[in-house]
Amino acid sequence: MHISMFDFSIYIKFFVSLCALVNPIGMIPIFTTMTNHQSHLERKKTNLVANFSAFIILLISLFAGNSILNAFGISINSFRIAGGILIISIAFSMISGKFTKNNKTSKEKNQENISVVPLAMPLIAGPGAISSTIVWSTYYSTWSDFLGCSIAIFLFAFVCWLCFRAAPCVVEILGKTGINIITRIMGLLLMSLGIEFLSIGIKSIFSALLH
C-alpha cells in the first residue's frame, strides 16, 4: 500500500488534534487525584484499562460514527458545526484556566469503575474527542485512511498511558505552573482546530443552499 507524505501529514494532524483536545499532560493531576487511594499495581491496572477502553471507544467512533449520524438523520455538516463549537468551548476553558479546575470536580473514589467512567469516558474519549474523530472519518474515508487514523488513535492512547504511568515524576518536574502553561498552549491549538471545523461546516451548508 502506497502512502504519500501528504497522507502521513493527515494522520499526524489527527494525532496532534487528539493530543491537543484531551491534553494528556494536563490530565496528569486529575489521574493522580483519582488514583491516590490505589496501590501501585492497582494504579497500573487502572491506567491500562482506561486507555484501552478509550482506544476502543474512539475506534468505534471512527468506523461507525458516520452510520450513527445517518441513523439519526443528522447531516455531517451540522455535526461539523456542533463539533467545532464544542471544541472551541473546550479550548476556551483550557486557555482561561478553567479546564483542569472543572474536571477535578468529577473526582470519584469508587475503585471499581473509575478506569472506564470517568477516566476513559468522558475524560479521555470525551464528546470533543469523539466528535473530532467522527468528523475526521468523513473527511478521509478510504480503508488506508481508516488504517492510518486507527494507528494515530493507538499512538494517542499509548501517549496517554505513558503520561499517566509517569504521573508522579511529571508532576514533580513540571509543577502546577508548567502544566498550566502546556494546557494553555494545547488550548490555542484546539481553538484553531475548532474554528477550522466550524468554518468548513458553514461553508458547506451555504454552498448547498446556493445550489
Curated annotation (Swiss-Prot):
Topology in the membrane? Multi-pass membrane protein
List membrane-spanning regions: 14-34, 54-74, 76-96, 116-136, 144-164, 185-205
InterPro entries reported for this sequence: Multi_antbiot-R_MarC
Q: Which UniProt keywords apply?
A: Cell membrane, Membrane, Transmembrane, Transmembrane helix
Q: What Pfam family does this protein match (any one)? A: MarC
Instruction: Output a single Gene Ontology CC term carried by this record.
Output: plasma membrane
Task: State the compartments where it is located.
Answer: Cell membrane
Q: Which NCBIfam families match?
A: NAAT family transporter, PRK11111.1
Protein family according to the UniProt entry: Belongs to the UPF0056 (MarC) family.
Q: What protein does this entry describe?
A: UPF0056 membrane protein BUsg_257
**Organism the protein comes from:** Buchnera aphidicola subsp. Schizaphis graminum (strain Sg)
